Amino acid sequence: CIKNGNGCQPNGSQGNCCSGYCHKQPGWVAGYCRRK
């Protein structure tokens, strides 16, 4: 799984976050994993 702070996509195309949450703001190319 992807560690917190590393890049991710909410749709899971780059893998799943260890925390289970990918934070992505509108307009961002990619998000990052973090705790919810």
UniProtKB/Swiss-Prot annotation:
It is found in: Secreted. Has antifungal activity against C.glabrata. This is Antimicrobial peptide Alo-3. Its main location: secreted. It comes from the Eukaryota. It comes from Acrocinus longimanus (Giant harlequin beetle). One of its GO terms (biological process) is killing of cells of another organism. InterPro entries: Antimicrobial_C6_CS, Gurmarin/antifun_pep, Gurmarin/antimicrobial_peptd. The presence of a 'disulfide through disulfide knot' structurally defines this protein as a knottin. Keywords: Antimicrobial, Disulfide bond, Fungicide, Knottin, Secreted. GO terms for cellular component: extracellular region. Belongs to the AMP family. Disulfide bonds join C1-C18, C8-C22, C17-C33.
